[in-house]
Regions:
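Conserved pre-motif C helix in the palm subdomain of viral-like polymerases
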Residues: 49-78
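A short, surface-exposed helix-loop junction/capping segment
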Residues: 1-5, 45-48, 75-79
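A short, contiguous, amphipathic alpha-helix enriched in charged residues
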Residues: 13-25, 134
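Short, conserved beta-strand segments within well-ordered enzyme catalytic domains
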Residues: 13, 41-43, 53-55
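Conserved polymerase palm-domain catalytic core
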Residues: 26-30, 34-40, 45, 77-81, ...
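Non-catalytic, polymerase-adjacent accessory regions of viral genome-replication enzymes
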Residues: 1-17
């Protein structure tokens, strides 16, 4: 590909300035493929490990660009009661929602953690749903490539 993917973050401005034309061309042609993710395992409170795939800097920038485009497309369809990883939503908002719900008469709450949720997402179903709203095959191929490396 000719585009270096691993470099110190401090070199980002210099590297992206020289390499962006090649990255842009690959994105436009639909030939860009994300680089391999760096693997890292971090301990969970119960002692088990959570395995992470950390993308390189260029791939992170591209993922952020995709997020900025997809968020306004999909955000209106998400539950008002969902607060995780959503714009303008956080733990404080979730607590306020819980307090409002309690004040309205509810007395029970379910707390759950979907074990290994992202490991169990059906890739074909996810991509089918995304493709209903995203028609550009280059974007779909890019999302699929990112998903496969995660």
């Amino acid at each position: 590909m000719g585009v270096p993917r691993c470099f110190p973050l401090e070199q980002f401005a210099e590297t992206i300035a020289t390499d962006w034309p090649a990255v842009k061309q690959q994105l436009l042609e639909g030939t860009y493929r994300p680089g391999p993710a760096r693997r890292k395992s971090i301990p969970k409170p119960d002692g088990s490990l959570r395995h992470l795939g950390i993308p390189n800097v260029v791939d992170r920038v591209i993922q952020q660009a995709i997020l900025q485009i997809l968020t306004p497309i999909f955000e209106p369809h998400f539950s008002e009661s969902s607060f995780g990883f959503r714009p303008k939503r956080n733990a404080h908002g979730a607590i306020k929602q819980i307090q409002t719900t309690i004040r309205s008469g509810y007395r029970y709450c379910v707390d759950m953690d979907l074990s290994k949720f992202f490991d169990r997402v059906q890739h074909d179903v996810l991509m089918m749903r995304v493709s209903r709203k995203v028609r550009d095959r280059r974007v779909l191929r890019l999302i699929g490539g990112i998903y496969e490396l995660a």
